[in-house]
Curated annotation (Swiss-Prot):
The modification Phosphoserine is found at residue 72. Keywords: Acetylation, Cytoplasmic vesicle, Endosome, Isopeptide bond, Lipid-binding, Methylation, Phosphoprotein, Protein transport, Transport, Ubl conjugation. Changing residue 161 to A: Abolishes phosphoinositide-binding of C-terminus. Residues 147-162 are annotated as: Binds predominantly to PtdIns(P5) and weaker to PtdIns(P3) abd PtdIns(P4). The PX domain mediates specific binding to phosphatidylinositol 3-phosphate (PtdIns(P3)). It comes from Mus musculus (Mouse). This is Sorting nexin-3. It comes from the Eukaryota.
Length: 162
């Protein structure tokens, strides 16, 4: 029988300098969900969240952008991705049906603690989705992240690298 010998030589790498170690990564995509604002009155009341994007990925047309989105916009994005892409889309933070019950002891869906929990859940959702290479090619994701107004009558398509 032939004897196998493990090759234990180290890979040859170039020395790392401070810019390599602490400089910006070669490709990055940072998305923050912040600054919730409740607008409207009565049945027309809802909360919007600021979506801030910073990236150097060439597929995105803007390197920095800020838009405001409400929960129903996240639902739209999720349904578009499920319908049009091969991406397994993570769940959104749940709907708050019981928080709509009148005569609650708190503000229901407008309670500060609920809004903070939802904000964190939405940030986890959008970072998982936008971090997926196939999702990054979907026009609906680009509209959601970078267009001031979402054109819900758009034609679903893929984004081509610039």
């Amino acid at each position: 029988m032939a004897e196998t010998v493990a090759d234990t030589r180290r890979l040859i790498t170039k020395p790392q300098n401070l810019n390599d170690a602490y400089g910006p990564p070669s490709n990055f995509l940072e998305i923050d969900v912040s600054n919730p604002q409740t607008v409207g009155v009565g049945r027309g009341r809802f909360t919007t969240y600021e979506i801030r994007v910073k990236t150097n990925l060439p597929i995105f047309k803007l390197k920095e952008s800020t838009v405001r989105r409400r929960y129903s916009d996240f639902e739209w994005l999720r349904s578009e991705l499920e319908r049009e892409s091969k991406v397994v889309v993570p769940p959104l933070p749940g709907k708050a049906f019981l928080r709509h019950v009148p005569f609650r002891g708190d503000d229901g869906i407008f309670d500060d603690n609920f809004i903070e929990e939802r904000k964190q859940g939405l940030e986890q959702f959008i970072n998982k989705v936008a971090g997926h290479p196939l999702a990054q090619n979907e026009r609906c994701l680009h509209m959601f992240l970078q267009d001031e107004i979402i054109d819900k009558s758009y034609t679903p398509s893929k984004i081509r690298h610039a």
